[in-house]
Amino acid sequence: MKRDIGFWLLQVPGWLLLFYLVYAQAIPAFSYETGVAMGTQEPADQITEVGVAFWYGFAFADLVTYIPLLAAGLIGHYLGKTWGRVIICAALGITFYWPVVCLAAVMAARNAAGWNLINESPYWIILPLIALWGAWGLWFILKELQQGNKS
């Protein structure tokens, strides 16, 4: 397997994202209040109890679905395994999807009663970058597969 710049642009940010997800999402899946104390989750007084339930749902889903897929996909891709490419594509699809959902929710909730998110800027800076990386990663894996079929 050729380990060009694209390979590393998938692997390195992927591992950084995985470690961040374990810290920012897996821990709050067990204790949302711990996530609030760590600064990785928003408190109910800023986003309402419904907002907390929404963000907790993402944390729990990340714990049981996204984190395992991303970890297995990164390992399998690193090893050059076909199953790794399939699994990393599943994780990259989620990587593209969830930032879009979160940004849509932040926009839709702006004028909702009880929604007092102090600063949206981090959402609008980081989440589009994550979504773009996910979309790029899908394209890159497709390119890898096409090149593999030619050799």
Give the location of each predicted region:
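Topology signature of small-to-medium multi-pass alpha-helical membrane proteins
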Residues: 1-151
